[in-house]
Amino acid sequence: MKYQAVIGLEVHVQLKTDSKIFCGCSTSFGSDPNSQTCPVCLGLPGALPVLNKKVVEFAIKAGLATNCSITQRSIFARKNYFYPDLPKGYQISQFEDPVCQWGWLDIELNGETKRIGITRIHMEEDAGKLVHADVPELEDGSGVDLNRACTPLLEVVSEPDLRSSDEAVSYLKQLHQIVTWLGICDGNMEEGSFRCDANVSVMEQGAEKFGTRAEIKNINSFRFVKQAIEYEIQRQIDLIEDGGTVVQETRLFDPDNGVTRSMRSKEEAHDYRYFPDPDLVPLVIDDDWIQRVRQGLPELPEHKKQRFMSEFSIPAYDAEVLTASRPLAEYYEECVACHHDGKAVSNWVMGEVTRGLNDSGLSIENCPVTPRLLGGLLKLMDNGTISGKIAKTVFDEMWKSGKEPAVIVEEQGLVQVSDNGAILAIIDEIMAKNQGQVAEYRSGKDKLFGFFVGQVMKASKGKANPSLVNELLLEKLKG
């Protein structure tokens, strides 16, 4: 019997605000435990929450970028449950009226496009964190760090439109790209800034009714998402084929062993006893506010990708790579403004610039070779001042010193040799030293031509004009 997986993702996006969602405490990561708390995020009696306006703006941005409708009157609700890291005994979230609804993202996989629905995006506060190790004060037990409590989150809930782990990862990567592109999330999955829960079920191929789902909680890498979903799909299929029944439950992914493990029975909405939070008035978002946010949106990745392809005549692969992050796309576009050959710039940004960044551990924002310097280097290649090989030498020196490419070329005597007489003299010398190879070439071994080119370039220390070398060599070797 064949089975079909059905997958929906709930993605938690930690917002990059300076302060928390309902108080003025800092959201910075890595501070001493419980050093960024106040009566509001500690849940002390009488402390009242005040909504952070920046959180609402970020939510509207996310909704517009994912083709959602913005709810113009939404409310906050209390989600009631007990856990040691939840000091109030409830989480302030949204239930019936989320801030964004009914959006979508298109994903591309194996040359095909598929639209994935987004049910809702809602604002909520994060809980604290239980610390099970490295707590000197506790010999045997756990500590509670409430620095993260009240940190602003968006929860992005997809429709159950995903049918494989690859589709889930593709959707997740696109959502990650959008929220980091907008600047509303740093996207750091290791620190929990972007994490997801995967709802997975299986049904017989062609069936209309979905199977019983299991929810895999808090997966924090794309690789783990793929592994967890694939394991869970196979676990459920094996269970059904053995005559068992899939139980609706919450599971955790164990990355060390590549398996999911049962955590608890899966709660339904009524288990949380949602009701409107009496301490927070309804949130009203008027048309003017939505329009102001819309006007402030940057050009989004997919639109920029298509524009790069049409405006700069680069292939889809290049455009995909260059729009992987907003800073990289902006760097490329600034380079093209300095040197108008879009494909040449693309080759250098994807090649030498990326290599330099990887080797030095730098981000594109801190690249020592500015767009102006790279543009200047490419102009020296275009006008024949230096060869492509010499350009790489100049680039490495620019990376180290930040000097102008023309200055480096002059200081190191790297100007390309385009004098026929000088190049012919080198060719004559090479042919005199390699008479055997000359005879073999003239007898039909054309592949030896590359050998002669290499010898001439070596003798000229890479400065001979390659096209002129090829032209003159062909003439001389003909005899």
UniProtKB/Swiss-Prot annotation:
Protein family according to the UniProt entry: Belongs to the GatB/GatE family. GatB subfamily.
Claim: ATP-binding is one of the keywords in the record: yes
Gene3D superfamilies: 1.10.10.410, GatB domain, N-terminal subdomain (1.10.150.380)
Enzyme class: ligase
Keywords assigned: ATP-binding, Ligase, Nucleotide-binding, Protein biosynthesis
Database matches in HAMAP family: GatB
Role this protein plays: Allows the formation of correctly charged Asn-tRNA(Asn) or Gln-tRNA(Gln) through the transamidation of misacylated Asp-tRNA(Asn) or Glu-tRNA(Gln) in organisms which lack either or both of asparaginyl-tRNA or glutaminyl-tRNA synthetases. The reaction takes place in the presence of glutamine and ATP through an activated phospho-Asp-tRNA(Asn) or phospho-Glu-tRNA(Gln).
Enzyme Commission number: 6.3.5.-
Gene this protein is translated from: gatB
Keyword rRNA-binding attributed: no
PANTHER family named among the record's database cross-references: GLUTAMYL-TRNA GLN AMIDOTRANSFERASE SUBUNIT B MITOCHONDRIAL AND PROKARYOTIC PET112-RELATED, GLUTAMYL-TRNA(GLN) AMIDOTRANSFERASE SUBUNIT B, MITOCHONDRIAL
Subunit structure: Heterotrimer of A, B and C subunits.
Gene Ontology MF terms: asparaginyl-tRNA synthase (glutamine-hydrolyzing) activity; ATP binding; glutaminyl-tRNA synthase (glutamine-hydrolyzing) activity
Protein name: Aspartyl/glutamyl-tRNA(Asn/Gln) amidotransferase subunit B
Reactions that this protein is recorded to catalyse: L-glutamyl-tRNA(Gln) + L-glutamine + ATP + H2O = L-glutaminyl-tRNA(Gln) + L-glutamate + ADP + phosphate + H(+); L-aspartyl-tRNA(Asn) + L-glutamine + ATP + H2O = L-asparaginyl-tRNA(Asn) + L-glutamate + ADP + phosphate + 2 H(+)
BP terms from Gene Ontology: glutaminyl-tRNAGln biosynthesis via transamidation; translation
SUPFAM superfamilies: GatB/YqeY motif (SSF89095), Glutamine synthetase/guanido kinase (SSF55931)
